[in-house]
Amino acid sequence: MRFDVISVIPYFFDSVLTSGLLNIARKKGEVEIYIHNLHDYGLGRYKQVDDAPYGGGAGMVIRPEPVFACIEALQAERHYDAVIFLTPDGELLEQPLANRLSRLENLLLLCGHYKAIDERIREQLITMEISVGDVVLSGGEIPALMLMDAIVRLIPGVLGDSESALTDSFQNGLLDAAYYTRPADFRGMKVPEVLLSGHQAHIEQWRTASALERTKIRRPDLLERAWREEF
């Protein structure tokens, strides 16, 4: 799988791409990640990429010329399954969306910055808009990393335990169950006996009940959504 990421602060990605899961995936040859500096396509001597908004108001807006030039140059080299803009008013990033995107080959991510991007970019170039929540950040770099991490961990061969990602929270519409490890008794707090029994069927029943209970308490909206989809 390949990611091409467009950003006005490309150095933001340096430490993350040389450590952790994304670095492991790259070393295994499962993922390619390329960061492109939008300023390389900027205008004039100072490589300008932003300007004041028509109509006045606070903040700056990313100009269309650099973005069109960058994306068109990349599209001339390969086909992208999706050109994604990270924005607060996009489709909410949830597990089913990450699952779908993990089956694609080439994704192009545009990180917003400043107040906004020129609307003509969204109308003509962007095929998908994704939000990580109802909150405004200083740029799309953190959402881009979140999106890549959510996708990459689903690619077969990336995680040491291939089933780990398939049993995470949200994969079946529920939060994950509670987990315990050694010691079995810590300061009088004991691990549930069923988890020590070795009886796998009983363990799975306990985990299902635990997942349902945690979801009911912490995210009842997930149960309501599942009920609506069922009926």
Swiss-Prot record:
It comes from Chlorobium chlorochromatii (strain CaD3). The gene is trmD. Homodimer. It comes from the Bacteria. Belongs to the RNA methyltransferase TrmD family. One of its GO terms (biological process) is tRNA N1-guanine methylation. It is found in: Cytoplasm. It catalyses: guanosine(37) in tRNA + S-adenosyl-L-methionine = N(1)-methylguanosine(37) in tRNA + S-adenosyl-L-homocysteine + H(+). Keywords: Cytoplasm, Methyltransferase, S-adenosyl-L-methionine, Transferase, tRNA processing. The lineage of its organism: Bacteria, Pseudomonadati, Chlorobiota, Chlorobiia, Chlorobiales. S-adenosyl-L-methionine binds at residue 112. Its EC number is 2.1.1.228. This is tRNA (guanine-N(1)-)-methyltransferase. It is an enzyme of class 2 (transferase).
